[in-house]
């Protein structure tokens, strides 16, 4: 339990930040899930459109330190490669 006033304030700030980050992470995961579902159905046009929404969501999450930059880049790269396979 926090004893000092500053520690109590820090605890409140952490709780607020955690809630915001959780929301952003959920939104990011949903965007990625939409791409994966479009890939599973084999709909290339829908997958490309979903990726256009997912890529900025991933990069924003990386920029705000919700996920690591390399993690975001890796996810975008892998999703792009899967979409490229659909074209063949």
UniProtKB/Swiss-Prot annotation:
SUPFAM superfamilies cross-referenced by the UniProt entry: Ribosomal protein S20
UniProt KW keywords: Ribonucleoprotein, Ribosomal protein, RNA-binding, rRNA-binding
UniProt xrefs under Pfam families: Ribosomal_S20p
NCBIfam families: S20
Family, similarity comment: Belongs to the bacterial ribosomal protein bS20 family.
HAMAP family to which the protein is assigned, alphabetical: Ribosomal_bS20
Physiological role: Binds directly to 16S ribosomal RNA.
Protein name: Small ribosomal subunit protein bS20
Gene: rpsT
